[in-house]
Amino acid sequence: MQVFIYHTPELTPVHTLPDCAVVIDVLRATTTIATALNAGAEAVQTFSDLKTLMQVSDTWQPEKRLRAGERGGAKVEGCDLGNSPLDCTPDLMKGRRLFISTTNGTRALQRVEESPIVITAAMINRQAAVNYLLDKQPDTVWIVGSGWEGGYSLEDTACAGAIADALQEQSGQMAIGNDEVIASIALYRQWQNDLLGMFHSCSHGQRLLRLHCQEDLKYCANIDSLDVLPIQKEPSILVKL
């Protein structure tokens, strides 16, 4: 298994795809997706465009759908939810489909959606992603951070490093595909005992603090707290494995 890390979807190779893509948006899309599926959502359907989200979700009965929209960290008017994983309670999610569009994570999913296998990961379900990769042993793995509007994201890179670090420790056979893997592991090891402190330091974490999302940051920092793996059933649709 050869692992590559790309800090943003824009940095991935253009004319090829991996055997398995792991998409990360720690703050907060992939944390929310994992939480929604763990809480009983039937599926999570992702959109980069809010207008398309509204059109597609309109074809569903209101009691069977939830719309989650976020731009710049804030909830989009007309949606039921923003992008807070804390809103994904079993009472709200059970049996419903979550239609979601976020600033960054949904764009990263779009870039790799034609890969044979697409999964999503965050700090909270890191080990579930690692277990899947160790079990399936895909030849090539891309771990793709969502970044922020095309730029580098500290927390996504640290999460990618957390996955690569665990793969290396637990298998001993992971091949390093690019230098970003080495750098990401080093970054994760620097912050592994203070993930919340890292979230408070990084630019997107500070953005969320200004929006009074302190509890979201605490939740997103709970590494290996959920044993759930979102996997793509068809392009843009994720289900619980």
Curated annotation (Swiss-Prot):
Keywords: Hydrolase, Magnesium. Its EC number is 3.1.3.71. It is an enzyme of class 3 (hydrolase). One of its GO terms (molecular function) is magnesium ion binding. It catalyses: (2R)-O-phospho-3-sulfolactate + H2O = (2R)-3-sulfolactate + phosphate. Its cofactor is Mg(2+). Belongs to the ComB family. This is Probable 2-phosphosulfolactate phosphatase.
